[in-house]
Amino acid sequence: MKVFQESDSKLTELNQESGNKAFDYEKMIQSLVENNLNVIFPSLEFLTTEYQIDGLRPDSIAFDNDRNSFAIIEYKNVKHKGVVDQGMSYYQLLQEKREAFVLLYHKKKGKLLDVENDVNWDETRVIFISPHFTSHQKRASRSVNLPIELYEVSRFENGIITLDKLESKQDTKEKTSTHTPLIRLDEYSEEDYLTGKYSNNYNCNHMVKR
């Protein structure tokens, strides 16, 4: 992506920072997003950071007021091969520990949510934000209806930050209601998804345990 700065009707291309000048550790991205969550994702309400539950520790927990659902946000400062596996694991965590996340919401916001009626668990999603994703992850995000969203973050000179969502199948095709069988995620790994072992005839919006 080319980014320009305008001055007196003239454009100057800004240089993209890389390596240590961009995001040399994940906390830089995490702090940037958490401190500006309502600007970056207006529908998301920040709940907590690095929430430890069931042996896992998601980076950021948020509640989507438009979808009435929870979202986990993960940050990577380098390419990471386990994005899909980690995303599915966190998705399943939210499904298995619904009461714990509703209790967390009550603790942070002082509001009571009914586990079954006030939260749309089908809209649960895991968001990954990173400067880089592998070509396989990008392809998977376009072709498989996973509850995972990928965003590429870039830093340019003069303090310019860009955040680009990688287009998914969900973005280009309306969701349809189906009654297809559930699958067990422990039968599939990220490699299985990328090599085609996983059949996308199944409804990934209702995945069960990894």
Where in this protein do the model-derived segments appear?
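Charged, terminal alpha-helix-loop-beta segments
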Residues: M1-R210
